[in-house]
């Protein structure tokens, strides 16, 4: 038991170093490449995480390059790495303003033209919608975590916040839902943990919701939750 705990700790430290050093290198390349499609080519180097750590990301489904809004659950820093590594488009993340203010590492967001929102600003929704329109006009798909913060990686999602709903309805967007399973087991920063586990990205079929339906957003959450549970139980049979 103690040896397993030590092994998990060492694995977590190694993966943290890979992320920290790898991201630092990517940020430097992003700076020089920032005017070229928001440094999308250098951002793809996130895929090196998998070869350097031996992690195999199982992918089910396909990316819909016509989808304008991507919604996915949030468990780990790796969720961003997963999509940055493999999504074919110049995606634009919607993130908390505080993340862009982190010394040096905040440049991963600011140098690449991501949307940073101030949750304390009462006019924040106006600024958010203005920024979203700008990115959509640049033909950049938007990516948002509807839970608003990291979940604990168990069976249940956190309640979806209204941000994704407001954006989708305002611009009548085609949505591609995605679910991530076990990314928190591959790397968890608080507490620092990493396990040998299978991890999976499931890309659901995209669609344009019936925005006249008052329940479309709840139905989206139910659909994602159902799909997540199916794969969660498949990858974690001992937890049923």
Swiss-Prot record:
<keyword id="KW-0443">Lipid metabolism</keyword>
<keyword id="KW-1003">Cell membrane</keyword>
<dbReference type="GO" id="GO:0005886">
    <property type="term" value="C:plasma membrane"/>
</dbReference>
<keyword id="KW-0594">Phospholipid biosynthesis</keyword>
<dbReference type="Pfam" id="PF01553">
    <property type="entry name" value="Acyltransferase"/>
</dbReference>
<dbReference type="GO" id="GO:0003841">
    <property type="term" value="F:1-acylglycerol-3-phosphate O-acyltransferase activity"/>
</dbReference>
<dbReference type="GO" id="GO:0016024">
    <property type="term" value="P:CDP-diacylglycerol biosynthetic process"/>
</dbReference>
<keyword id="KW-1208">Phospholipid metabolism</keyword>
<dbReference type="GO" id="GO:0006654">
    <property type="term" value="P:phosphatidic acid biosynthetic process"/>
</dbReference>
<keyword id="KW-0012">Acyltransferase</keyword>
<dbReference type="InterPro" id="IPR002123">
    <property type="entry name" value="Plipid/glycerol_acylTrfase"/>
</dbReference>
<feature type="short sequence motif" description="HXXXXD motif">
    <location>
        <begin position="74"/>
        <end position="79"/>
    </location>
</feature>
<keyword id="KW-0997">Cell inner membrane</keyword>
<protein>
    <recommendedName>
        <fullName>1-acyl-sn-glycerol-3-phosphate acyltransferase</fullName>
        <ecNumber>2.3.1.51</ecNumber>
    </recommendedName>
</protein>
<comment type="function">
    <text>Converts lysophosphatidic acid (LPA) into phosphatidic acid by incorporating acyl moiety at the 2 position.</text>
</comment>
<keyword id="KW-0444">Lipid biosynthesis</keyword>
<comment type="similarity">
    <text>Belongs to the 1-acyl-sn-glycerol-3-phosphate acyltransferase family.</text>
</comment>
<comment type="pathway">
    <text>Phospholipid metabolism; CDP-diacylglycerol biosynthesis; CDP-diacylglycerol from sn-glycerol 3-phosphate: step 2/3.</text>
</comment>
<keyword id="KW-0472">Membrane</keyword>
<keyword id="KW-0808">Transferase</keyword>
<dbReference type="InterPro" id="IPR004552">
    <property type="entry name" value="AGP_acyltrans"/>
</dbReference>
């Amino acid at each position: 038991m103690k040896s397993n705990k030590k092994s998990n700790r060492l694995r977590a430290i190694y993966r943290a170093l890979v992320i920290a050093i790898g991201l630092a290198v990517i940020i430097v390349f992003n700076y020089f490449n920032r005017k070229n499609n928001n440094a999308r080519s250098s951002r793809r180097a996130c895929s090196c995480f998998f070869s350097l750590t031996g992690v195999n990301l199982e992918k089910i489904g396909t990316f819909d390059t016509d989808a304008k809004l991507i919604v996915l659950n949030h468990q780990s820093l790796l969720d961003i790495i997963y999509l940055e590594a493999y999504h074919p488009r110049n995606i634009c993340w919607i993130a908390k303003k505080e993340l862009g203010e982190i010394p040096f590492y905040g440049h991963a967001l600011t140098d690449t033209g991501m949307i940073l929102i101030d949750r304390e600003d009462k006019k924040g929704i106006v600024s958010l919608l203005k920024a979203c329109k700008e990115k959509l006009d640049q033909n950049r798909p938007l990516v948002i975590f509807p839970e608003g913060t990291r979940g604990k990686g168990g069976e249940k999602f956190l309640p979806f916040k209204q941000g994704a709903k407001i954006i989708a309805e305002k611009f009548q967007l085609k949505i591609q839902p995605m679910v991530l399973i076990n990314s928190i087991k591959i790397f968890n920063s608080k507490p620092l943990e990493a396990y040998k586990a299978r991890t999976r990205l499931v890309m659901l079929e995209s669609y344009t919701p019936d925005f006249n339906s008052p329940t479309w957003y709840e139905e989206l959450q139910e659909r994602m939750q159902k799909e997540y549970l199916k794969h969660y139980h498949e990858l974690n049979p001992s937890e049923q």
